[in-house]
Design a protein with these regions (language model features):
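Oxyanion-binding "anion nests"
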Residues: 1-29
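Claisen-condensing/thiolase-fold acyl-transfer catalytic domains that form or cleave C-C bonds
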Residues: 6, 10, 28-118
Length: 118
């Protein structure tokens, strides 16, 4: 799974940048599935995206499966997203050896805070 995860998602993101003619230098954030911090760090380095553009929620919430990207958006950069426009690349991938990437332009979206229940 590790080999797949550091090969296919970066290739998918590079394909996205080529298809839509933009550079990762121009994005505000790269939000990756939160499966493993080491793996996400490797993907970021492989794509040459600065660490400060890659928010993490893994340490607080663990691997939350398909919810990891929206959770990371809310807890990692939610306040910033409500105050400013942002160009964001998201990439999800999983142990079923599946992956997907998207380029989204956000315009002052409303990010409600995460509600934690006991």
């Amino acid at each position: 799974v590790f080999g797949f995860s550091i090969k296919e998602p970066p290739a998918s993101i590079k394909s996205l940048t080529e298809h839509y003619d933009f550079s990762l230098d121009d994005i505000d954030y790269l939000i990756l599935h939160q499966a493993n911090k080491y793996m996400d760090d490797k993907i970021g380095k492989k794509l040459k995206v600065p660490a400060d553009k890659i928010p993490f929620s893994l340490m607080q919430y663990g691997n939350t499966s398909s919810a990891s990207i929206p959770i990371t958006m809310v807890v990692g950069i939610g306040e910033k997203l409500s105050l400013e426009d942002a160009d964001v690349v998201i990439c999800g991938f999983g142990s079923g050896l599946s992956w997907g990437s998207a380029y989204i332009k956000l315009d002052h979206i409303i990010c409600l805070p995460l509600i934690e229940l006991d």
